[in-house]
Amino acid sequence: MRLYSSFLQSAVLVSVVLVIAGCSISYSSKSISDSTSSIVSSPSSVSGKSKHYQNEVADYTMAYVKSSQPNANYSTFLKGLSEVAAKEGVTHWEQDSLTYIGIGKGLKKAKVEGIAYETYKKNFAQSDDTRMEEIQIGYESED
Amino acid sequence: MWLNYKFVLFYIAFVAICLCSALASAASFEYLYVEANEGNSSGGHSALQLGDEIFHYQHHDSGFIRLLKENQQDFHFQYRFLQNRRIHSSQVEVSDETFLRLRDHFKLQFLAQDQQFKQLHRLHKDRALLHVLLNRQDAVVGTDFATILRLNAAGLFYAEGELDRQQKDEYIGLVNVKPSQSFSLLGMLRRKIEQHYGQDYLSRRSEQITAQIRSLTPSDWPLEQSMLAVDKFPPAIESFAERYTDHLSGLVAIKVLMEERMLRPDAFLLTLEAVIPEEKEALERLRDQLMLSLVKSIHSRRPDWGYAVLVNIARLVAIDMTLQLDQWVFVDDFGMDSEWISADELAQYAESMQIQIDDALSNWMQMRKVLLSPGDLTEANYSKLEMSANRYFELLKGAWQPAIRVVGEKALPTKSIAVPDWVVPELTQQQLTLALSALNSYEAKFRQELAGYYRYDLITRNCVTELFRTIDRALLPLSQADVDSSKQPKYITEESIRRLGGHISAGYNFIPFVSFQSVQAQYRVMNNVILDSYRDQQLKKQLIQNDRLTVSLRESNTLTSTLYSYHPGDAFFVFFTDGNAVLRPIAGLFNTAAGIGQSVLGLLTWPLDGGKNFKSGATGILMSVPELLFFNIRKGSYKYLSYNQFVRDNASKY
C-alpha cells in the first residue's frame, strides 16, 4: 500500500512536470521544409517573390533605424542587409532596385522624416542619385 | 411616401453604421495551442500567428529562450505532420491598427534579439582571433580556432589548409602578374575588369586590402550602463574578426581570378541531365548577367564583397560548364552542418525516401520551368534551382553511396576553409592584451544583460509567459513607454482589454493548455478550429474508406498500425492513447511495461550503443506514467514525410 502510494505520488509529480514543461526541451533540428519550402510554397508570381524580399528588407531597415542614429556606422547595417538577401539566395542586393525600395519602405515604417530621413536616404544610397530615387519610391509607396 | 423615404434613410444609416463597425475590427490573429508529444515541447506549445507568419518562443540549448519567426506552412509541417500534434487555433478579433501594432512589434523584437545573439557570436570570434594573435591558443582549451574563423565560399576553390601551404609571398606576387592572355572564362572576366578599372587594378586592390589588414585595430567595445533592450539592436560595433575575414575573402577572390582557378572536384555537382535549347538560351543570358554583375561587385565597398564575388565566380563556372557539356552542372550548396543519413537508415526508410525523391524531382522540374518564364530569370530563382538540384541529385546518390546528406542545402553556397596565415593585423602584445581585457569586460556585461532578458525558467520565463509579455509590450501606449514603470501594468491592462477583449497575465499563465483556456475566456475569440495532426488526417481517410472497427483495432497499436512505424527517434510504445480516454490507464500500463523492457534491453546494449536504448526506454516510461492518470502526452512522430503532399492537402488553409 505504501509502495503504491509512493508510486502514485511520483506519477503525479512526473505528470505535473511534463505538463508544465511546455517548451523546456528544445533543440535545433533541421527539417526537410528548411530547404523545400521556399520552392514549394513561394508565390508563383515575380511580384509575390519580390514583395517578400522587399518586406524583409523593410522590416530589417525599420528595426535598425529604431535602434540607431542617422550618422551611425553603416557597415553593420550593410552586413545585416547581406544576411537578409542571402536568405533569399541573393548576393547582388546592392545592384537590385528592390533593395532600395525596401529600404524606403522601412524608413517610412519607422516614421523617419525630415532631416533624419534625408540623412538616412543619402547614406543608405551612398549618395547615388538612382538609389536615392528608389528609396524615395519605396518611402512614398508605404502607407 | 414621406414615411417610406424616412424608412429608406434610416435603413441606409443603419447599414452604414454596421459597416463602419465591421471595418474598425476587420483584422484578426490566431492564438495557437500545440498539443503535447514526446520530445520537443513535451507539455505542449504556444504560438501567435500574425498574417502568414508564426511567432513562438523556444528554449535553446544555450539556456536562453529565443523568439522564432516561421513561415506558417513550415510551422504546421513541423508540428502537425512530423511531430504529429494537433493544433488548436483561436481566431481573435482585433482592429487593423492593433493587428499592425502586434505584427510590427513581434517582428522588431525578433530582429533585435537575432542581432543581439549574432553579436554574442561575433564576440566569440573576436576572442578567438585575439588569442591567436597573442599566440595563446592554450587559453582556448577545447576550442578549435580553425572551426571558428572560416572563409565562406573559399572552399569551393581551395582545399582545407591548401592556402596555408603556399608561401606567404606567393599571393603578393600578384603585383607583378602580367595581363591575362587566357581565353578561359575567368580570363575573359579578368580582362573585362582590367578594361573597366585599369590594367593593374587587381594588383592594386590586393595591395590595398593587404595594407588594410595590417592596419586593422580591434573593435571599440564601450561599456555602458545599459547595452541592451528587447526591442533594439545591440550597439553597432564592427567585429574585428569579421573585418579580418572579409578582407581575406577579398584577397582570395582576387587570387581565384588571377590564377583562373577552377572549382574543386567536390565543389560542384555534374548531373547527367541534358539541357534543352530554351534552357541554354536562358543560361547564356544568365551567364552574361553574372559577368556584368561581377565586374561591378569586384569594385564594391560593402564589407562582404569578397564572399559575393567567390559565390558568383563559382556559379559562373558552373553555368559555363553546363553550356559546354549540355548537361546541368551546379555548385554544391550543402552546408558544413548538413545532416547525413547512412545506407542502413536509407534502407530502413526506403518507402519514405522514395517519396522524398519524387518530391525532389517534382521541385527540380518546377524550378526548371520557372527559369524559362519571362521576368523570372533572377538570381533568387537560380538559387532555388540550385537548391532543388542539389537535393534531388544528392538523394539519388543514396542508391550507391554509403551515406548521403538528407538536409542542409543553403540558399547560397558556403563551402569554407580555415583562415590562412598570410597576413595579420600588426598589433603589439600590449595592444592585444588591452583589447582582450576590454573584450572580456564587454562580453561579461553583455552576457549578464542577455541573461537578464532571456534566461529560460520553467515557470517564470517560458514559451507561454514570453508570448504574453511580448503582447503586453506591443500594446503599451507609446505615450506611456517612458512613464513610471509602476504605472505601466495598469495602462497595459486597460489597453489589452480595449484592444483584445481582456488581459492575460504572464505570471499566472505559464502552462500551454491553461493559457489556451485563458485566451478563450479573456480575448475576443471569434472562432476556434482544431487542425488535425498527420495521423488524425490519415486515420479519418481510412475510417471513411474502410470498415471502422477493423481500422480502429488495427491502428490502435504500433504493432499492427499501417500509419505509423516505430523509429529510434521515439521511445518504444505499444498503444496510442490520444483517443479513448477511458482505456488510457490500461494502455498506459502496457506502454510503461514496454518502456521498462526497452530500458532493460538498453542496459545490455549499452556497450554497443552508448546508452541510447536505455535512455529511450527511460523516456518511454516517463511518457507512459501520465497515461496511468488519464493524461496523454505521447502520439508518435514521423521522421520523413512529404512536404509537397502536406502543401497539397492543406492548400485551402494557406
Language model features with spans:
Chain B
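Glycine-rich catalytic cores of cysteine/serine-nucleophile enzymes that process amide/ester linkages
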Residues: A27-H124, L151-A154, M188, E207, ...
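Carboxylate-rich, polar loop motifs that coordinate divalent cations or form catalytic acidic clusters
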Residues: A24
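Hydrophobic alpha-helical membrane segments
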Residues: Q58, L67, E97-H105, Q109-F110, ...
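Bacterial N-terminal signal peptides that target proteins for export
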Residues: M1-I12
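Active-site nucleophile-His-acid catalytic modules used for acyl/amide transfer and hydrolysis
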Residues: E30, F81-S226, V230-D231, K410-I504
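N-terminal signal peptide c-region/cleavage motif recognized by signal peptidases
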Residues: L19-S21
